[in-house]
Amino acid sequence: MSKIKELFESGKFKSAFIPYFTLGDPNYNDSIEFGKTILDGGADILELGIPFSDPVADGPVIQRAVARSLKNKFSFDEIFRVTKQIHLHKQETPLVYLTYFNPIYHCGITKFLDNAKDSGVVGLVIPDLPFDTIESETLFQELRLRDMDLIHLVTPASTKKRIEALRKTSTGFIYYVTSFGVTGERREFSVDLKERIRFLKDTIQLPICAGFGISTPEQASQIAGYADGIIIGSAIQRVIEENGQDASKAKNVLADYITKIRASIS
């Protein structure tokens, strides 16, 4: 049983809290400290973003974070070292990479997965993963060999045919994109969000975690009433962006925000 499957079956929470931030922003050491702060604040799963030059699914806040990380020339070796330091701080909390396929392909699928697993990563979210290619089939097989999860994104535009295809290779949980467009904070969500999540639960029979746009404790609490998990990225990245020049202040503001979100969905 994968670590993520075990977590969702444990009954430890009403809805999982899955924060996200981009590795390497604003620098190597602060990435480690921010990761530790988020874990201490009550993350059930921590999603770590690997910087890539063409983050097509990301909104402006995360795009700027990625740009800062790339400006630092954050290497694969540094990504894996930072990840391991975060993992060692709280080894019981699953870590997941959000990455585009190009970095995996560039590194080499087996090399990337070996290093990721050694660093404490138990699953991948790949927004632009191609289907029905030799590379994707290799990735599916190599993930299964390592008991690592492949977490697919489902959007409001996903067809039944697409959802059925995703069901065959999805493990861990489904990342449900709450609204059209890229990542970023939003004031309102679709009126049929609750029904859509229930449909996915019945169809795919995996935990459904909602992300894209959630930023306030009130939003998190509302959606946690019917989603198995809440994913928050842009709001966390904004805290880092606005306070990153003062690491101590950033940690305090981040800790306060994470604690409030965690309390809202407990």
Curated annotation (Swiss-Prot):
Q: List the EC numbers from the record.
A: 4.2.1.20
Q: Does the keyword Signal apply?
A: no
Q: Which Gene3D superfamilies match?
A: Aldolase class I (3.20.20.70)
Q: In which pathway does it act?
A: Amino-acid biosynthesis; L-tryptophan biosynthesis; L-tryptophan from chorismate: step 5/5
Is Transcription one of the keywords UniProt gives this record? no
Record key words, sorted: Amino-acid biosynthesis, Aromatic amino acid biosynthesis, Lyase, Tryptophan biosynthesis
GO CC list: cytosol
Chain segments annotated as transmembrane? none
Q: Name one GO molecular function term.
A: tryptophan synthase activity
Enzymatic reactions: (1S,2R)-1-C-(indol-3-yl)glycerol 3-phosphate + L-serine = D-glyceraldehyde 3-phosphate + L-tryptophan + H2O
The active site is formed by: 47 (proton acceptor), 58 (proton acceptor)
- Assembly description: Tetramer of two alpha and two beta chains.
Q: What does this protein do?
A: The alpha subunit is responsible for the aldol cleavage of indoleglycerol phosphate to indole and glyceraldehyde 3-phosphate.
Can you tell me which family this protein belongs to? Belongs to the TrpA family.
Q: What's this protein's name?
A: Tryptophan synthase alpha chain
Q: Which organism is it from?
A: Leptospira biflexa serovar Patoc (strain Patoc 1 / ATCC 23582 / Paris)
Identify the taxonomic lineage of the organism of origin: Bacteria, Pseudomonadati, Spirochaetota, Spirochaetia, Leptospirales
Question: Gene name on record?
Answer: trpA
